[in-house]
Structure formats: C-alpha cells, structure tokens
From Swiss-Prot:
The gene is FYV5. Keywords: Cell cycle, Cell membrane, Cell wall, Cell wall biogenesis/degradation, Membrane, Secreted, Transmembrane, Transmembrane helix. It is found in: Cell membrane; Secreted, Cell wall. The lineage of its organism: Eukaryota, Fungi, Dikarya, Ascomycota, Saccharomycotina. This is Protein FYV5. It comes from the Eukaryota.
Amino acid sequence: MQYHSALYVYIYVTFTTIPYKEKPDIISICFSMLSFVFDFSVRICSRTLESFSWSLISSSAFKVVSAFSLAGSCVLASRSSVGIIVSLLLFNFSTCNFVLFLSAVLIDLFFCTFLPTPTFLPTPFFFMLHLPIFSLLNALELLYLIIAGLHI
C-alpha cells in the first residue's frame, strides 16, 4: 500500500501544481473530492490491515498522502473562495495531522510562489528532476514528509 501511496503523491502533486488560471473553482473542487475519496478508501483499507506489522508504514504514508492531496487542493484553490472553502471543509473529514498538512501547504506555496517556473514545463517541480537543484529540493521535501509522517 505504501508504494501506491507514494505513486499517488507524485501524480497528485504533479497535477495540482499545474497553473490552471481560467477556471480554478471547478478543478480545485474536483481534486478536493478526489482527495477525499482516496482518503476514505485508504482509511478503510488500513483498518483491515491493522494486524500486519507494516501497518505503521502504510499509516504514515497515508498521512503524507492526505496532507499532500489536501495541501495541493488548497494551494490550487487559493485563487478562488469556493475552492478553498471546499478544501477546508474536506480537511475536517480527513485523518491527516494538521501540522503535517500545514507543512505540506507551506512547501507547496514555496515551490509555486518563490521558485521560477519555466514556461516550457507544466509544473514547477516533479517534472524538473533532471535539474540538480530541483532534484535536491524534491529529495529533501519527500524525506521531510516521510520522517514527519513516521513520527506523527
């Protein structure tokens, strides 16, 4: 399950950081609903796997996924009041820790706001792994979120 969660983190963050500027309301609501559905389904699956010894790993990966998906929705919906309200309402039904969620929001805001985004690439990071500085930042970001998820 932790491998599927890591793959979901890559896919979700990649698509939520694409700068949709025309209709952020519809897209942010769709991604928020997608994160809520995934959050609910993984919660059910993790409860059935509590007897296994690696349930802690899957639970930590699930917290990282929840934080990243909701943070991506909030960052994407920051241009619209409807999207941000939906994202915050869905956060109340999530199981991720608020500190981890806030950390993911700040990391996403840093990547989307302060780092330069080339026009020929659709997203600020995860498509820029061939550049050394972004590879280092991606590695540090994922390492931080994994360690934070294991200790929360």
